[in-house]
Amino acid sequence: MKKNTENTNAFLIHISAFAGFIFPFGNIITPLIAWQTLKDRSHFLDEQGKEVVNFNISYTLYVFLLTLTFIPFAIGSIFRKNHDFWNSNHFNFDFGFDNIFGFIGLVSITSIVYLTGIALVIIASLKAKEGENYKYPFTIKFIK
């Protein structure tokens, strides 16, 4: 295969992770299908496909664990202010400063994680377009 076509295909495998914004788990399914389709054409495409799929599985796992970490705090902060809910028949939505700062912290951490994921996919796509073998940071090797 020509090097230019190989680089373009590697670029497309990396950029296909943005399908996760269109449908659930698209960031895993789309690169997996692209990698399975193109992996026999060259060693470079095989390596980059594995790298993309491993990163997106790891990234999805990290986001899931982050969500699980914050759910108890979110539920606890809502019900802490509403401990007398069963006696008063109204729900108090006055969160106060502690909950506002908690919400701002949650939004900040979530934004950083999502923007980091987007930036890493863009960087990897551009490196693959140049023919470089890019390795994502913090990636668990599910597929070896």
Task: Label every PLM stretch briefly.
Residues 11-28, 54-84, 98-121:
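Hydrophobic alpha-helical transmembrane segments in multi-pass membrane proteins
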Residues 1-57, 123-144:
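Membrane-interface extramembranous regions at the lipid-water interface
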Residues 94-111, 131-144:
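Repeat-unit-sized solenoid/scaffold elements
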